[in-house]
UniProtKB/Swiss-Prot annotation:
Residues 231-459 form the NR LBD domain. Expressed in the liver, but not detected in the adrenal gland (at protein level). Restricted expression in adrenal gland, kidney, liver, brain and lungs. Strong expression in heart and muscles. Residues 205-230 are annotated as: Hinge. Pfam families: Hormone_recep, Nuc_recep-AF1, zf-C4. This is Retinoic acid receptor RXR-gamma. InterPro entries: NHR-like_dom_sf (IPR035500), Nuc_recep-AF1 (IPR021780), Nucl_hrmn_rcpt_lig-bd (IPR000536), Nuclear_hormone_rcpt_NR2 (IPR050274), Nuclear_hrmn_rcpt (IPR001723), Retinoid-X_rcpt/HNF4 (IPR000003), Znf_hrmn_rcpt (IPR001628), Znf_NHR/GATA (IPR013088). Belongs to the nuclear hormone receptor family. NR2 subfamily. Receptor for retinoic acid. Retinoic acid receptors bind as heterodimers to their target response elements in response to their ligands, all-trans or 9-cis retinoic acid, and regulate gene expression in various biological processes. The RAR/RXR heterodimers bind to the retinoic acid response elements (RARE) composed of tandem 5'-AGGTCA-3' sites known as DR1-DR5. The high affinity ligand for RXRs is 9-cis retinoic acid. It comes from Rattus norvegicus (Rat). Residues 1-138 are annotated as: Modulating. It is found in: Nucleus; Cytoplasm. The keyword Transcription regulation applies.
Length: 463
């Protein structure tokens, strides 16, 4: 294979076993030369003698402590071309290379042979890969590609699932042949008896499946216990009590087809909202753990969510109204009046995205209260001193609402999700109301922080 190698490689004087060779030599092979061309017409290569191995600078120099990391980094990066040039003041140790010694000891092209474990001369600097590092595990049962070690044996997902089902359901199989069926990738489903027996023979453990099932049961019980703790900490009964406590005390809403003629719809809505804002603080104080927060955080949460909280209330109150909304004052605002007042677009969204959806799913007051509590406990409200505590309270309300819907409406597994889907619409409509100054008369000249602070400092009135 290397018989003609001498025609393409020119070794300089003093290389290998020639008389001019003394000690270690730094060399570079010349380029291939055409036969018959004199060497004088090409660049010459000179031997550069290397002295004894050099060490790093003496202890005490600033760079001495960085010597070892510097060598590692430069070795990993490697020089772009040629030999590595050591920076001034640093002497790098030139480690002896067994591969370099092998090359230097060659005296002729016939003596050049590939190094053991290497595919050829060209890959001299790359160590061979160990055979074990490329081995891929196969399923011990059917020979398919293994997805890992399952129940003590490397197996594929198919055999893993088969064994687990067999153990968990305590299945019993029979073989139609002689109990020696071939189990491979193509025929593994042919005989369940022989497949199961092979699982056992190859080392799959029944107890591993049983332990896995026990861990799953314990995990489910733990999650249920945590959820139960959340329900006890945020009982839906108290949330419902808060809703009922602030319900407008009007015996009758009167004729819902007639609305006040003294004011325009926007004024009526603002007046009703102004009255409801006082009861909103009373409602929030009745929600479990809200009063445990700092007074400043209570103000921030109410300031961040008052518009959504009020919109949710009058939307749910309006499910019995045809094409309009019912205010806490007992006044009914029709769609046509809202359009004539210039707030028709946002009014239509309230009817379509909130009132209509609440009516279709027959949202009850407990669910409404939970949704409002979720809005109230907003951990993203700016300025909170302890947002993580607020987030924990919100998660407890989530758990309470989910448990309530599962217990009250077991035939509607998707009800919890449908309830939560009203929250983005409520947020969007609330922001739009502020954008249109929908409640511009609500506060007047009083800053909202001071306004809410005065109400929060008022003792809770039990009625």
């Amino acid at each position: 294979m290397y018989g003609n190698y001498s025609h393409f490689m020119k070794f300089p004087t003093g290389f290998g076993g020639s008389p001019g060779h003394t000690g270690s030599t730094s060399m570079s092979p010349s380029v291939a030369l055409p036969t018959g061309k004199p060497m004088d017409s090409h660049p010459s290569y000179t031997d550069t003698p290397v002295s004894a191995p050099r060490t790093l600078s003496a202890v005490g120099t600033p760079l001495n402590a960085l010597g070892s990391p510097y060598r590692v980094i430069t070795s990993a990066m490697g020089p772009p071309s040629g030999a590595l040039a050591a920076p001034p003041g640093i002497n790098l140790v030139v480690p002896p290379s067994s591969q370099l010694n092998v090359v230097n000891s060659v005296s002729s092209s016939e003596d050049i042979k590939p190094l053991p474990g290497l595919p050829g001369i060209g890959n001299m600097n790359y160590p061979s890969t160990s055979p074990g590092s490329l081995v891929k595990h196969i399923c011990a049962i059917c020979g398919d590609r293994s997805s890992g070690k399952h129940y003590g044996v490397y197996s594929c997902e198919g055999c893993k699932g088969f064994f687990k089902r067999t153990i968990r359901k305590d299945l019993i199989y029979t073989c139609r042949d002689n109990k020696d069926c071939l189990i491979d990738k193509r025929q593994r489903n042919r005989c369940q008896y022989c497949r199961y027996q092979k699982c056992l023979v190859m080392g799959m453990k029944r107890e591993a499946v049983q332990e896995e099932r026990q861990r799953s049961r314990e995990r489910a019980e733990s999650e249920a216990e945590c959820a139960s703790t959340g329900h006890e900490d945020m009982p839906v009964e108290r949330i419902l009590e808060a809703e009922l406590a602030v319900e407008p005390k009007t015996e009758s809403y009167g004729d819902m087809s007639v609305e006040s003629s003294t004011n325009d719809p926007v004024t009526n809505i603002c007046h009703a909202a102004d009255k409801q804002l006082f009861t909103l603080v009373e409602w929030a104080k009745r929600i479990p753990h809200f009063s445990d927060l700092t007074l400043e955080d209570q103000v921030i949460l109410l300031r961040a969510g008052w518009n959504e909280l009020l919109i949710a209330s009058f939307s749910h109150r309006s499910v019995s109204v045809q094409d309009g909304i019912l205010l806490a004052t007992g006044l009914h605002v029709h769609r046509s009046s809202a359009h004539s007042a210039g707030v028709g677009s946002i009014f239509d969204r309230v009817l379509t995205e909130l009132v209509s959806k609440m009516k279709d799913m027959r949202m009850d007051k407990s669910e409404l209260g939970c949704l409002r509590a979720i809005v109230l406990f907003n951990p993203d409200a700016k300025g909170l001193s302890n947002p993580s505590e607020v987030e924990t309270l919100r998660e407890k309300v989530y758990a309470t609402l989910e448990a309530y819907t599962k217990q009250k409406y077991p035939e509607q597994p998707g009800r919890f999700a449908k309830l939560l889907l009203r929250l983005p619409a409520l947020r969007s409509i609330g922001l739009k109301c502020l954008e249109h100054l929908f409640f511009f008369k609500l506060i007047g000249d009083t800053p909202i922080d001071t306004f809410l602070m005065e109400m929060l400092e008022t003792p809770l009135q039990i009625t």
